[in-house]
Regions:
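Residue-identity detector for glycine
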Residues: 7, 36-39, 52, 63
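Low-acidity, Ser/Thr- and Arg-rich intrinsically disordered low-complexity segments
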Residues: 3-5, 15
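Cationic, low-complexity basic patches in intrinsically disordered or flexible, solvent-exposed regions
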Residues: 30-33, 43, 61
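Short, positively charged and aromatic/hydrophobic N-terminal segments
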Residues: 18, 53-57
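Charged docking surfaces used in two-component/phosphorelay signaling
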Residues: 135, 224-404
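N-terminal Rossmann-like NAD(P) cofactor-binding subdomain of oxidoreductases
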Residues: 63-257, 292-294, 327, 358-359, ...
């Protein structure tokens, strides 16, 4: 599967399910060789070529080229989010000078074709970050806890997709459309929110700024790719087993996921909530700088490959109409409103897979609270806006704000 953009071509050997589910994203992609390079190949970094710079939130002066390029390490490069990061970096022409692909010892020696070079995956160790400007982490909490201090000590700015640092008081937890200003407080580590938290905050923020939230009740419907490649394979295999009349064998989840729903994402805690639900609650409060905001979440795993969906009930301080809510959300960056019930138009995971925006529909007055409540439905690609795209956007903001 080949993803193309001007100046950088990335080839990644991914499984057929991504090819199918990325139909919208890949429909207009074609094979094109790069026109040239900005530098020679110099180990230990595999040198790509300088590529243009794009930021969705900061306007760059017309005709002014950014010449700075950066040595980038991707930890968890062989995982679903790591691979998505590489594709999005190409699409958005992120200014990469050198690229180091890191993973666990199980992936050492695997080659991933980036541009004109087949880059060999190296084992991620504390010594992997010499000469690195930016390190993207998409690994376990344990790996992030172990390696990020070493990366920061080596001089890298780290953007972390795990839960390791999210609730640390001195670590910014950032959705660029919401709280990019928090980046100025970073000390070498920036956290990415959990994948259902990001689109929730992104959608509610433009309304909250003018009509403060009082309460959020959210039910999430989360795809298996949020768990990882093993869960994707399990859904595929269980579907085959059931269709052939056999019993489904579960290894990743506590119950069969094919043709089923599991009202459990992550482990249960003593409160009766799951760890995932508390992530949504606490991360939303931190991102919005509202530590007392009333939030309740129920997180459900669903037999969908890509795309997290959410049914949201939001109560505001003052009366708000569905029309006013729609207008404010529609004007916000990174949000597309799809809301035309008369023609059955609303977002679905299938239609949103491979898209950058968060899609919002089913906007209506919340009948349980009256004029101060809005109910709506949102869908986002959890591998993109829920993870890899958010990381790229944070990195873009760091560059524009001279915070690298």
């Amino acid at each position: 599967m080949l993803s193309r953009s001007i100046g950088l071509v990335i080839h990644i050997d991914t499984s057929m399910w991504i090819t199918v589910l990325r139909k919208n994203f890949l429909a207009d992609q074609h094979h094109q060789r790069p026109k040239g390079r900005s530098g020679d190949w110099k180990p230990p970094l595999k040198v790509a070529w300088a590529i243009g710079y794009h930021s969705a939130y900061t306007t760059q002066p017309q005709g002014q080229e950014r010449v700075s390029t950066y040595n980038v390490a991707v930890v968890g490069a062989t995982g679903l989010v790591g691979q998505e990061f590489l594709k999005i970096a190409a699409q958005r022409r992120f200014p990469i000078k050198g690229l180091r692909l890191l993973a666990s010892h199980r992936s050492v020696g695997r080659k991933m074709t980036v541009g004109e070079w087949a880059i060999e995956v190296e084992e991620a160790t504390p010594r992997s970050f010499q000469g690195i400007d930016l390190a993207i982490f998409s690994a376990t909490t344990e790996v992030s806890r172990e390696l990020i201090p070493a990366a920061v000590k080596a001089g890298a700015v780290c953007i972390d997709d795990s839960a390791a640092w999210r609730m640390e008081p001195d670590v910014p937890l950032v959705v660029p459309e919401v709280n990019a200003e928090d980046l100025k407080e970073h000390r070498g580590i920036i956290s990415i929110p959990n994948c259902p938290t990001t689109p929730l905050c992104q959608t509610l923020w433009p309304v909250h700024k003018v009509n403060p939230l009082k309460r959020i009740v959210v039910d999430t419907y989360q795809s298996v790719s949020g768990t990882g490649a093993a869960a994707v394979e399990e859904l595929t295999e269980q579907t085959r087993q059931v269709m052939e009349g056999n019993s489904a064998q579960s290894h990743v989840y506590p119950h069969q996921i094919a043709f089923n729903l599991l009202p459990q994402v992550d482990v249960f805690l003593g409160s009766g909530y799951t760890k995932e639900e508390w992530k949504v609650i606490n991360e939303t409060r931190k991102i919005m700088h509202e530590p007392e905001l009333a939030v309740s979440a129920t997180c459900v795993r669903v037999p969908v490959y890509v795309g997290h969906s959410e049914a949201v009930h939001a109560e505001f301080s003052k009366a708000i109409s569905p029309e006013d809510f729609t207008e404010m959300v529609h004007e916000a960056p990174g949000i597309t409103v799809q809301d035309e019930p008369s023609v059955n138009l609303y977002p679905t995971p299938w239609s949103v897979a491979g898209r950058d925006d968060t899609y919002v529909g089913r906007i209506r007055q919340d009948a349980s609270v009256g004029q101060t409540g809005i109910a709506f439905w949102l869908v986002s690609d959890n591998l993109r806006k829920g993870a890899a795209l958010n990381a790229i956007q944070i990195a873009e903001e760091l560059i524009v704000r001279n915070l690298m």
